[in-house]
Amino acid sequence: MLHETFTIELPYEELGIKQQGSATITTYIKDVFPKDQDPFKRPLIVICPGGGYNHHSPREGEAIAIKMLDMGYNAVVLRYSLAPVTYPAQLFEAAYTMKYVRDNAAEWDVDPDKIIIAGFSAGGHVAGLLGTGWNSKRLDYLLENVLHCSHEYVKPDGMLLG
């Protein structure tokens, strides 16, 4: 399994956000097949744990990711920035995460048309922000000048809110 954590690097001040964000992405990717085989492309779920924007619930992150692996999904846990970091930082971090997943879909044997975002409680709010606001003008500067991709590229293919 490919299991690694890294920090999301965004120019928060340039994006109009006063506090520096502290978001991370942790991958839970099943073993990747050799490229000369015709591998099964798995769906992937981006998981946003809840916690009232003051912590990330441990039972809504890794535990859910492992369960999703058992169900045939690859998973990524987005630990978005918490208070005092304010909106739209979490929306930007979710968009960044979707781009990162799509950029790595071929390498991870992920079906690029089956990338879902899920969230619980406050994480459900973050998932809903991107799931319903992927084409928002709020994302224009980030997508055009920082991530260099289209609105459609960060659009989730499905949403699960809990």
Which stretches of residues belong to each language-model region?
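N-terminal cap/lid segment of alpha/beta-hydrolase-fold proteins
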Residues: 1-41, 87
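Short amphipathic alpha-helix adjacent to the substrate-entry channel of hydrolases
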Residues: 39, 57-76
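Short beta-strand element of the alpha/beta-hydrolase
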Residues: 41-50
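Catalytic nucleophile-loop/oxyanion-hole region of alpha/beta-hydrolase
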Residues: 56-58, 78-112
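Glycine-rich, phosphate-binding/catalytic loops in enzymes
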Residues: 62-65, 94, 133-136
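Primarily recognizes the serine-hydrolase "nucleophile elbow" in alpha/beta-hydrolase
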Residues: 99-162
